[in-house]
């Protein structure tokens, strides 16, 4: 393990030198690739540095314990050795987790599809609530988000469907745990008897594909244009700027109406289509690798009920790991860190267990 960590440290230094090369400014694609790789290694290098410092301190304390004759000093050295041994063991465990094989897609940006399910108007309102939750979480993480497409419901403020693009560092690696069915239990504003209604919204988190990931034949595509129902000033309902693309072999559809020109909407819709096809390809690869563990945390099973938001009890429960929080208002404002961190830690523990078997 130490040899592997040393090699990573040297690679990190090489990347640092490469990124300082002024000529790299002329090749933005290579710069982004190197910078992403550099960022991915930084956490491992920092953890390894901390491990090495504490291991050196432990060695010095053990030497003092072995050579010291003064009783009081020996007792102090013994206490320090015990404390440092515990710290070094924790850091070593952390390094083992960091060295787990990274999923290639983890560093990708994402497209999130949020769809109202059972529950009618209440489900569409909760779809809007989840949209705001993810937008605020993205803001807290320093990520960028953009609405690509949406379908409003009959109730004001509700959505039958919302499609978001979120871009930033390690977005899919963080957001992939959100795929699945989110259930809400609350009393609708229109409920005169005060009865609790249960509704559901499905969330699909897809790693954004690059052009090289998926080959799409133009002959397999059908392009339709229609009038945008969203923003666009004088273009609204007058010019067909919205674009819908259908991939004929699979029947997969991607649409975008949020850009101001037909060309921009077409480019966005193509990106969404590539992402959907890449997601299918990725799922097939994961299945072939038999990488489906007992836990459903990262399998992305979108038919599985993953979380319940109980408003009367101000409770959020993630059913995959038995996690419960009574900070529902804060979570709905984007404070998802505690939930996602618990899911990541559980997933890492399961993967480490699998690696050691």
Swiss-Prot record:
It holds the Pfam family RF-1. Methylated by PrmC. Methylation increases the termination efficiency of RF1. One of its GO terms (cellular component) is cytoplasm. Its main location: cytoplasm. GO terms for molecular function: translation release factor activity, codon specific. SMART domains: PCRF. This is Peptide chain release factor 1. The keyword Cytoplasm applies. Keywords: Cytoplasm, Methylation, Protein biosynthesis. The modification N5-methylglutamine is found at residue 234. Peptide chain release factor 1 directs the termination of translation in response to the peptide chain termination codons UAG and UAA. The gene is prfA. InterPro entries: PCRF, Pep_chain_release_fac_I, Pep_chain_release_fac_I_sf, Prokaryotic/Mito_RF, RF-1. Belongs to the prokaryotic/mitochondrial release factor family. PANTHER family: LD18447P. It is found in: Cytoplasm.
């Amino acid at each position: 393990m130490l040899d592997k960590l040393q090699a990573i440290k040297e690679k990190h230094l090489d990347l640092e030198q490469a990124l300082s090369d002024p000529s790299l400014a002329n090749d933005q694609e290579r710069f982004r690739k190197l910078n992403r790789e550099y960022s991915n290694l930084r956490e491992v290098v920092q953890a390894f540095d901390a491990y090495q410092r504490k291991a050196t301190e432990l060695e010095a304390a053990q030497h003092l314990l072995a050579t010291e004759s003064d009783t009081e000093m020996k007792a102090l050295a013994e206490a320090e050795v015990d404390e440092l041994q515990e710290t070094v063991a924790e850091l070593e465990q952390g390094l083992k987790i960091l060295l787990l094989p990274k999923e290639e897609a983890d560093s990708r940006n994402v497209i999130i599809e949020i769809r109202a399910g059972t529950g009618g108007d209440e489900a569409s309102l909760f779809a809007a609530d989840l949209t705001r939750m993810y937008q605020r979480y993205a803001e807290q993480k320093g990520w960028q988000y953009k609405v690509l497409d949406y379908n409003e419901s009959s109730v004001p403020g509700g959505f039958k469907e919302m499609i978001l693009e979120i871009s930033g560092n390690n977005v899919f690696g963080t957001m992939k745990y959100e795929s699945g069915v989110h259930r809400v239990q609350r009393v609708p504003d229109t409920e005169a008897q005060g009865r609790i209604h249960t509704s559901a919204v499905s969330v699909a988190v897809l790693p954004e594909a690059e052009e090289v990931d998926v080959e799409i034949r133009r002959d397999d595509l059908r392009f339709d244009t229609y009038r945008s129902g969203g923003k666009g000033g004088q273009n609204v309902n007058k010019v067909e700027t919205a674009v819908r693309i259908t991939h004929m072999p699979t029947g997969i559809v991607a649409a975008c109406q949020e850009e101001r020109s037909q060309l921009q909407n077409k480019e966005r819709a193509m990106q969404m289509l590539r992402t959907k096809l890449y997601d299918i390809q990725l799922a097939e690869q994961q299945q072939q690798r038999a990488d489906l563990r007992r836990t459903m945390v990262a399998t992305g099973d979108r038919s599985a009920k993953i979380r319940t938001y109980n408003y009367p009890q101000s409770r959020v429960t993630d059913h995959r790991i038995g996690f419960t929080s009574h900070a529902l208002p804060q979570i709905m404002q984007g404070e998802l860190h505690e939930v996602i961190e618990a899911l990541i830690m559980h997933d890492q523990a399961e993967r480490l267990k699998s690696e050691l078997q």
